């Protein structure tokens, strides 16, 4: 998931990258952005991609900064959001080094901290903390490791219903996932279209924010339909549905 990868993906972003905004049918993200909105405050979208969330942020904050690792994604974001006069676009890799960033009151970060490198993820979270004003709010969305495991279990069940033995059903999932590395699974790293992608446990997120200068307000599911996981899922496959984790947290005031 380096710069070259994201610049390459940018050309077919809508078909290659899952749209959380389009599948957030209960508008959980939108309502939280509106909750923290202020015409006097500033916001950032870290990992903005081609700008899906920028119109919402632009409508709800005085000024918005759109950060992304890939210039080609930013080019599309500028084009898609050309009518937004209060957005600045910045190319930056927040996972490799500290950069000078203007402080903001609200940060949106949707499925951006998903690189397999723990050191890069740690630097990214440090960048978030440094970028946010004391008392400011973070809205974070990350893939759920529980959901990924649960989806595999449902796929095994589906394979069995199609006539495979249990062992064969398990191996079909294993082989279909490019024989996932056990060392990756121990870290919550799951292959998505053969790309190692960090997923998070709920308890892992709780522990993570205990170590940061944040008060954790909320961890809840953003649920999606089974079509987001499988092509042509069977009608019998219903709830519980797969999900991402949505986190809201507030940066502590300095004493």
Question: Which residues are covered by each model-predicted region?
Answer:
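Core SAM-dependent methyltransferase catalytic element
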Residues: 232-255
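Conserved S-adenosyl-L-methionine
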Residues: 214-225
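A short glycine-rich, Lys/Arg-flanked "PGG" loop and its adjoining helix->strand segment in the class I
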Residues: 122-134
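Class I SAM-dependent methyltransferase SAM/SAH-binding core
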Residues: 44, 50-96
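Acceptor-substrate binding/catalytic loop of class I
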Residues: 116, 189-204
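A conserved beta-strand element that flanks and buttresses the S-adenosyl-L-methionine
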Residues: 108
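Conserved class I S-adenosyl-L-methionine
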Residues: 1-38, 139-171
